[in-house]
């Protein structure tokens, strides 16, 4: 039998097991087993937009703990890993590290550059995920930019076209002037800023009246198409259906009632421009207002290309020409200057304002008109809320985030992006005479296609215009369950057998900040394609916080790379930290907690070394059979051993229940407390003397119990700290041919019914632990060694109840406390040190101490 070294070398052992698990295909999915025997997970494909940090490690480790548990239960595991390596986030990353702008180089050259970067970065990602002990099946790896993913994503698009759930329209879109692309509602975040509110004088047509309109965007005056007031605002009811004259530009615009106008904001009158914000869009649609677009794709005032009803067309053109070509902020300053010059600004005040900002570039968004592809979501809000209700949420509190997002939806999902490195739309536009502008869709049999290089059947190159846009990256990553199943729905697949085996999945794991994107879009796609949920359960992790308690993110530059932490403490210690955070709760990176994890790993090693030292020469097949028989057939003879096995049964039972509900943090704590307190601090101390004593009739009971207890502890810890548990399991059990396979193999989870359980034994054993605790407290107070002798140890119950302890338990207590005599009494005779706790009083008489008679 191999001996364990004095210290555990994680730097040597962790890479060893990473290689071993892969070589032996420990985590391989078995495609021959049916769906009901398989646990299918849909993990987040990391975005190739920078380094993976400790926050990614936290989320993946939490999922991996659940996956390892399910595998040990006996489930066939489908645990893929994907990389979201297309779209705007990846493009921005490539632009940054290559110091280029995609718009300034040839499209093929930029795409090639992106491909080279993602291949290198994904190699780093794989090393990272291996280092933290992720139990994925690497043969299931996918990339969202791959040919297969492109085919599946384009299949999804065409299926939604056929189901009339996709449309193309020239309509208002959220526009990022930095990245030069349309964005969806989910790509946007709110930004608070201080700005100026200008109260501007408008004339009322055919009247001497002047009205004030408050706006933060005076540069939009030439795009003004109406004035609104709340119909309940008595100040302006007399103006209904009259006309206002815009300052400077002298446009004639109607004054209309609109119940969504905030009476208390500004003057209560508001101008509607095309388009200053999303309210303008809603009012423009509702009231069928004219369109006057003045902002171009670059965030500048475009040349005048529309006509308006102005009382002075010459002045309109004169003032407009003064702002043409200016950036928005410059145009605003110029219009304010002109308004001041004409004494049209009544007052100006500083306000706090919330504006829409691009999540990636940070650009303040504009709203422009552009032809884009959209997926219908607004009309499905009720159905999507029902799907949210059907989904099992862990924790339940996260459901409201999705519900609130669905309820807030005002726009359909814009999936067009005016970028380069993404999934192309399988679309062309006809130039053929008589069908100019006709949309031509690829046939599914052609997929994947790139319309820039491929042609639709029956058309020549000169007869079509390719759609040069690419899809929103979420349009593909939202298909992550289908990217694994190789099918869109049961009626549209690449591999129908595989799709039916894997779709829908069992569990989605992700962080809460992408509920409005990845969760929502995946549910949308699954609902529209197959009228089902993509998975039955979803577990949501919290944020990983930096030392300043701010969310850790690549964009904020406050990330902590786990490489140094793993080198300093080991991957198991980092996993320990990640599994201290309750599901859905934010977790601060704490080297102190990681250090506690390292101490736990060392404690496991040292406990195993101690046990091994005392069963040397006994580890034979017969020994294993005898130990298994004695434990599982409940024929262990000593009370202390039975108490430990009863506590172990409780631990197995409670840990299983907690992990079944994805409460990994509570499960880890339960196992840890049993190991440290019950097993190491108390049980091993109680039985240590019996293990040493070869003449004791109870030695075999102790050795069998210790041996089986350690094996079970390693199995319970395996989902949490896989490297140390595998090392010890291999050294003690595999190397002696006592167990087959990895501890992380199928059917290695302990069964609660295989352990002794007796409430009386538990009560009796707990009493013994209470006595031991009080003795330790007494010796500590007297600054005595734990081995200090005791002449007389007496126990008196505080209540009328009276219970003698079994003689074998008394023997263990006397040995561990080094007591000459032990008794349970109703009254003390000689008193030395009285100490009380948990329903009992203990009298401890030390040799040579001052004592008195009662």
Curated annotation (Swiss-Prot):
What is one GO biological process annotated to this record? valyl-tRNA aminoacylation
Q: Extract the PROSITE patterns matched here.
A: AA_TRNA_LIGASE_I
Name of the coding gene: valS
Spell out the reaction equation it catalyses. tRNA(Val) + L-valine + ATP = L-valyl-tRNA(Val) + AMP + diphosphate
- Its main subcellular localisation, reduced to a broad class, is cytoplasm
- List where the motif 'KMSKS' region lies: 551-555
Indicate where this protein resides in the cell: Cytoplasm
Question: What is this protein's name?
Answer: Valine--tRNA ligase
